[in-house]
Amino acid sequence: MKNRFLYLPIVFVFLIVQAHAKDLKWVQRVEPTNWWTEMSQQEFQLMLNGVDLQSAEITIQSEGVTISRKVLTDNPDYVFLYLKVAKNAIHGKFNIILKKGKKTQTIVYELKQRRKGSSERKSFTEADAIYLLMPDRFANGNPANDSITGYHQGVHRNIPGARHGGDIEGIISRIPYLADLGITTLWTTPLFDNNDTQYSYHQYACSDYYKIDPRLGKNEDYLRLSEACHLNGLKLIIDVVPNHCGSSHWWMKDLPAKDWINTWPTYTSSNYRMTAWTDPHASTADLYRLTHGWFAPNMPDLNLQNPLLFDYLRQVYVFWIETANIDGMRVDTYPYNEIRTAARFIQSIRNEYPNMNVVGECWVKTPAEVAYYQSGNKNKDDFDSHLSSVMDFCLKDVFSSAFNESEGWDTGMSRFYSLYAQDFVYANPMMIMNFLDNHDIDRYSIAVKRDVRKFKMGLAMLLTARGFPQIYYGTEIMLDGIPGDYQGHRFDFPGGWPEDKRNAFTTKGRTADENEVFDYLKTLLVYRKNNTVLQSGLMKQFIPENGIYVNFRYNQTKTIMIIANNNEQEKVLDVKRFKEMIAGKTEGKEITTSKTYSLQNLISIPAKTVLIVEIK
């Protein structure tokens, strides 16, 4: 197992000039840097970038690879070759020859042998618990790469919006910690090169799709991260960003085509109104602004409707899935693209990996809108996103409000009841990703004003909800933040840096409150990991009464009763009302305390507490 990736180095294209003149290196960049035999789609795109390439005659010396077409754009410095790989093609290197008159340049390109069973790889499911982290803010395992010559930003931990030095090596060193916590899947925000002049730490403004940012590590380190995950029983999710690149991307100085990005006479942002896609009365102007406006001034809006860019980006993610043995995808800002093009884009990747699941960021505020984006939903317009999962921003809003409110018809615990009552709109409510917070919104600790009782209620409701949970790094220690401030959502994990005064990755390095939260979450995660009833079990809920909300998760072998008391006082619950679920059962054990409860008559529930009772 330790040598799994020795056969998968990222081989860069060799450019060999077969002439004496120094100026004959017409081709300066070839992407992707390698490809594979035995892919489902036999044809792949090869982008050549250099100087006046369109005047060159191009041939290939290979028995198993042929040029199926050559596509030119309005920029003479680019040529797009579509190469067809025969089904019986043998892996190895072959020559691509460019000729201008008597002068030639030879590119040595490599086809690798595809990993056996690659297309059948398994993905994350409703059985998983996902841990989201920002690499720059999690742990610094290699201080030597903190600042790199030629990159605008180095490390300044005292500046919230600067780079802080976390890296892939730091993540690798903490994989056993995540496995012990009960995490089964890791999602990192992007790792691609990002040489922006400010806020480059978030990595969402890519400068080079085939290069891991050297301040995070080397390309080979990403492979090591994947191996570490798999050796410890974790899956790995890649963050897919088809909507935009970074203004520092190498092609921004010489765009492959005029319509490679969406442009305006002056800078124009998106209107960010994703509701326009489901609005039956939406104007064309609003939809155009949504999809063609830029997400931010430093994030040029990619024109995914350009077929050359479409194929280029598709191959980027296939390349990394294949190279680093990735298990799943999360798609950033999905509705900011023309959604039918985005759907084809995701489908084209899943054609290579039929079992791969994909969760989409579709930041809308009603269940009907969220459901529209889950694959399999019977939409009136027949739209299918090809997203097997969606992020439940509606449930996130309930978590942020319910425990701070007094009970009313539509406040407090009634929020949970009313939201779950709308699950009929989903094609598959068990494949929805639930979360308390993430890197784009306020920390959950802020929402509940650092009240440990409320925080634990949120964790309990999250880990027992239909769908599957996503935990944001630091949630296990109730990490603090600053409301309404992106940088305030992304504090460093204490102990991730050698110079930190304490190490919250350890029991001794945590406060009493932090250990209480950590131990509680770990108990819930481990229980969920080992009990399918909380992964795929059916759900039944009862209308909240007197500030107490009860629901059940159940399957053929086990029943779990979840009792949430949102009152500031201890309450007594008469369980006779729930006889359809507990008839014939006499007792149950609360999974976080191991306390036994009689189911004969009354149960006392402490104030601001969720009991999770396994019925015997």
Predicted regions and their residues:
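Bacterial Sec-dependent N-terminal signal peptides
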Residues: 1-26
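Immunoglobulin-like IPT/TIG beta-sandwich domains and homologous Ig-like subdomains
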Residues: 39-102
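Hydrophobic faces of well-ordered beta-strands that scaffold small-molecule active sites
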Residues: 129-131, 186-188, 236-238, 329, ...
